[in-house]
From Swiss-Prot:
The gene is rnhC. SUPFAM superfamilies: Ribonuclease H-like (SSF53098). It comes from Streptococcus pyogenes serotype M5 (strain Manfredo). Residues 83-300 form the RNase H type-2 domain. This is Ribonuclease HIII. One of its GO terms (cellular component) is ribonuclease H2 complex. One of its GO terms (molecular function) is RNA-DNA hybrid ribonuclease activity.
Amino acid sequence: MNTLVLKIDTILSKHLKKQLAPYTISSQNTYVAFAAKKNGVTVLLYKSGKLVLQGNGANALAQELNLPVAKTVFEASNNSQDIPIIGSDEVGNGSYFGGIAVVASFVDPKDHSFLKKLGVDDSKKLSDKTIQQIAPLLEKQIPHQSLLLSPKKYNELVGKSKPYNAISIKVALHNQAIFLLLQKGIQPKQIVIDAFTSQSNYEKHLKKEKNHFPNPLTFQEKAESHYLAVAVSSIIARNLFLDNLDQLGQDLGYQLPSGAGSASDKVASQLLAAYGMSSLEYSAKLHFANTHKAQALLTK
C-alpha cells in the first residue's frame, strides 16, 4: 500500500470532485471536505487543501486524475523507515485473562540506531523476559502514549446491549492513544496502525468517538514486522499487559495464563469455585467462550 500526500489549489479541487463524483463515499472526519474510493484507492481531500491517496494503486490513480505527483509531500511504501512515524499496536485482545493494552509510539529516523542496538523487533518474536528488559528503556527514550483497559472496565463496555464490541473497543483505544500523543506536539509524517480490521470498518466505528485528528492513517497487517514505531508499541504494550496479568493474579492468589486455551478454562473454573463470577468479572473478558467452558467444568 502506498500513501501519496499532495497540496492542491481550489481549481484542481473542483476538477477532482467532478471526476470522482460517481465514487464518492462518506467520511465522519470533520476535517475532510470530500472523500471517494476508486480502484481500491481511498481519496481524501482535506479542508486545508491537502489531498491524500491511500492504496496500492495510488500512483496510477494520481496519473489518471492528472495530479501533480512531482509535488508529492511524501510517498511512503509500507516498509518506509526514513520519515517520522507514529505506530500503534495492541496486546491482550486475544487473551481471556487480563486487560487490553494499546500503545502509540513516535519514532524519528534518529532513533533507529538506538532501537537496532536494543534488538527491537516484533514483540511476538521476543521472550517475555527480553520484553521486560527492553520496555523500560523504550518508555524512557521514545515518546509514546499507553492505555490500559482493565478487564472490569472491559466487561462494562463490551458485550450484548453494551456500547462496544470486540472490534469497536479497539478502534476507540487506538484512536485515543494516537490523539493523546498528537496533543503532546508530535508531528509525524505517517501514522500506522497494525491492521485488526478493514479501513472502512475502522472508520465506521470511529464515527461515535469524540476525539478526532486530521492525519491520514495507514493500515498494515503485521505492521510490527515492517515499522519500528509499531514494533516499539508492540513491546511496550506487551509489557504493560504482562504487568497487568501478574497484578490481577496476585490480587486473586492464582497464576493467570495468557491466551484463551484450556489452561484458561481450568483456572477460570477454579476461580469460580473459590470466589464466584465476580472474580472473572474482575480478571477476565466475560464474552469469551472460556466463561461457559469454565462453568461446564464445575459440573463435572
